[in-house]
Amino acid sequence: MKRRKFIHNSSLLAFSVGVFGTIKWDGHAYVGNDPTTTDILGPFYRPGAPFRVDLVQPGTKGDILHFSGTVLSKDGSTPMKDALVEIWHCNEDGVYDNTSDEYIYRASSNTGADGKYHFKTILPVPYKAGATLTRPAHIHMRISGTQLQDLVTQVYFKGDKHISEDMSSSNPRSLNRILDIGKNDNNEKVVKFDIVLKEEYVLDATAFKKITGLYEMSDRSMSDFYKDGDELFVKLNGQIMEAMEYKGNNKFEGGLGVISVQFELLSNGGAKVKVSYIDDDRKTVTLEGNKILKYPA
């Protein structure tokens, strides 16, 4: 399924979430041990990907890629053991597997004591995301299961002509996630990406229960807010679309500055929500909603 059609059918554009570290320029390159920046989640995240490190499909025409790195603590040097690393990307034809039991080009793996992860897959390709928009080749990642803040991000590849056209990859905060592609002794492509996590900041459990539930939005769509790890996820008309970090005062905010969600708790036990996001035309859209269904504690 093509990304634009998938998003259109879900009423809202798909954006992910997070809070970013700064990027430092040393006169030659962007460097430093600041937290890895987040990126859009996109509409194609599927939880429950199988634990495996070899994603290559028989008969693939894609270029073999070894994708590896180290997950580090907030100090930028201490390896994070047992972090859950999830990746997902399109196939060599620019299509995501959204429905099969095989979870094609989707995988999960836990880091070892050295904090390292490694996947053998193929290099994804750019794909059309509308009549005029082409997304550059990228790999989605989610890092969770640690005592630090969960992370949703993407990596891109140097030399991709579509990077400058894309709202996410062209953002200055994505610069240290545009990676070199090397080769190993077998002439297979190699990409390395080290990840630095940051301090966890979460809403307390009681307050989380008050805001989670099903909301009817002002555009008549249904937004289902729920907790996953230390983030607030939302399903739009049944599809997982976003994963947001807590910012304080019942507010959650998305990565690259594209989305914010503000909750208002009512005296009768209900709740309201105000969602603001930037669409593909870089215009701000605001929706409001009322909680219509509360989940059991």
Language model feature labels by segment:
Residues 70, 86, 142, 194-196, ...:
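Residue-level recognition of well-ordered beta-strand positions that form the cores
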Residues 84, 106-108, 116-118, 152-154, ...:
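Well-ordered beta-strand positions in beta-sheet-rich domains
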Residues 196-297:
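Peripheral terminal and inter-domain segments
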Residues 27-169:
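Beta-strand-dominated extracellular/periplasmic modules and repeats
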Residues 53-58, 162-202, 259:
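Extracellular beta-sheet/turn segments enriched in Thr/Pro/Gly and aliphatic residues
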Residues 67, 139, 153, 177, ...:
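Hydrophobic residues positioned within well-ordered beta-strands of beta-sheet architectures
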Residues 1-17:
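N-terminal secretory signal peptides and thylakoid transit peptides that target proteins
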Residues 20-24:
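C-terminal segment of classical bacterial N-terminal signal peptides
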